[in-house]
Amino acid sequence: MSEYHNPVLLDESVSALISSLSGIYADATFGGGGHTSEILRRLSPEGRVVSFDRDSDAIANRPDDSRLTLIRSDFRWIHNHLIHQGYGDGIDGILADLGVSSHQFDTAERGFSFRYDAPLDMRMNQEAAMTATDIVNGYEMEELEKILRIYGEVDNSRRIAQLICKAREAAPINTTTELGKAIESALPKFAEHKFLAKVYQALRIEVNQEMKSLEKFLSGASKALKPGGKMVIITYHSLEDRMVKNFIKAGNIEGKVEKDFYGNATAPLKAVNRKPILPQEEEIAANTRARSAKLRIAEKI
């Protein structure tokens, strides 16, 4: 499992999650199974875990434990699946690590990384229809500019979109190398990798509809918790962290606090930690992909 993905903030997240050793918990992002395995290790024989992942590669990491139910699904459907599993009355905690797994980054043919010459794929669910190739070759310039600006927070998003559209007029952009060549004139010197990472983030988020999935997940997860149940979420970039922070505060991703007739806030959660928990220096030294992680904890009211 460590070769597939090193779980981030493992002790901090699982300790925050578990309130009862015989409780029922969900790991919404199974990945390499690191968080799930640690939850199972700490639970009593009566405890149960339901884990989710849409990547078939991740499903192969299933530990041999009768207390685990592993479901291949986008986590946006977590509430529906938990009801189907007989947990309609609510569960004790839900954990989600929103990062891309090391396996996905390091498997060249998946197309998640600019470090390899590979097809522009980026699908977390390899049976999904749309790939990054479809986006860079099929989206109008205005659409490309929008996703680069919003999802990647790319400074010169319009220039990048123009270069992509110009390059594909000559020939389709089908590989990571071809994309890099198409936009290389707009890459800032001494910060090429950081800039490319933002471009790839934007494409990946669009391919996998990550923000829409996250919004539906937050809503479903808050409904799936019993009162006092914990929602524990690890974020990696400002866009998703803002969504999680706003949802914990207000019950919606805009962060707009709504009140009932009596003036009471109607948000279903309350924050457990005012400021996010960050990885220790030792963890970052051992796993550089943990450096941007933020852990937020909320409790169902």
Q: For the regions a protein language model found, what residue spans apply to each?
A:
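S-adenosyl-L-methionine-dependent methyltransferase catalytic core, i.e., the SAM/SAH-binding region
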Residues: 1-301
